[in-house]
Amino acid sequence: MALNLRKTHPLLKIVNDSLIDLPTPSNISAWWNFGSLLGICLITQIITGLLLAMHYTADTSLAFTSVAHMCRNVQFGWLIRHLHANGASFFFICIYLHIGRGFYYGSYLNKETWNIGVILLLTLMATAFVGYVLPWGQMSFWGATVITNLFSAIPYVGQTLVEWLWGGFSVDNPTLTPLFALHFLLPFVIAGLTLVHLTFLHETGSNNPLGIPSDCDKIPFQPYYSIKDLLGFVLMLTPLIAMALFAPNFLGDPENFTPANPLVTPPHIKPEWYFLFAYAILRSIPNKLGGVLALAASVLVLFLIPLLHITKQRSMTFRPLSQMLFWTLVADLLILTWVGSQPVEHPFIIIGQLASLAYFTIILVLFPIVSALENKMLNL
């Protein structure tokens, strides 16, 4: 009898091995849903982004007007725009939860998968930043000015680099056009990296909440986890659509309703909420170069996590001390996010500095110490 086409066809075989007959641990929890949710976020963002790009004009004199035109005159343009803007927020919620799950359950020991994942995060952050500039509102313009200007802190080449990025002596048309090109290109880079991420993941197979090998207890992905993922899609897309319909500007900045004006600086320049933790770390160091290095370190520190793993157990499931430290880190990140949205004045300055210090101390110092202590207590 002829074998199933999905098992023999060169292309369908790849799909089959990734989504249908994939052997999956039988005990992975809802925390493992965020990978597929990120995939749905990416597809949603590419589709809505493509529809927006058809009506957008990458020119300083027309960008703001073209976005307004989209919301007023294009069929469901307002909905597409708000799905795209809020979709970015959901993308970051999912990626932060996905990283948190990887950190908690020791998934970072699949080093290639983890490192590609960190590169994916950096690419996503770059994409979101350049996308935020495109509507050419006040916060778009000044956000672009402030963040690109950070490159001037690089010794010797900094100022030249900034002028090259700007295409002149300030953020203007030669800055906007390349940023639009980048914003169009980067999601496809993310899609390519996602395939690499999955390729490395399928080399080792998924981790599980116990952090032990699950080769003896695997079940096929279809139908068990495909239906579970479907539930995840519904639970994510429902609040996204509700937000786009009922509170589309809840996470946006009111300054962006004003067209960009180089002569008027907004009272508080701040990025979107998903960058606030890094922005707070940047602001907590009074020196410009030091701040830029701390900003970079706040994300690049993720590359070090596999090297700092000294515990004999993979997962934190049975390590209460590490669990306490993990949730302290989560609370610290929430404090940083809140501080980043506040003006630079007392007491927010000192709170931000203490929270930034705590962030690096927990990851680089306390986790290894506590891991060694747990090894000792358990005689491992």
Curated annotation (Swiss-Prot):
One GO CC term, this protein: respiratory chain complex III
Compartments in which it is found: Mitochondrion inner membrane
Keywords annotated in UniProt: Electron transport, Heme, Iron, Membrane, Metal-binding, Mitochondrion, Mitochondrion inner membrane, Respiratory chain, Transmembrane, Transmembrane helix, Transport, Ubiquinone
Gene3D superfamilies recorded: Cytochrome Bc1 Complex, Chain C
Binding site for heme b b562: 84, 183
Membrane topology of the entry: Multi-pass membrane protein
Keyword hit for Electron transport: yes
Membrane-spanning intervals of the chain: 34-54, 78-99, 114-134, 179-199, 227-247, 289-309, 321-341, 348-368
Major location (coarse): mitochondrion
Protein name: Cytochrome b
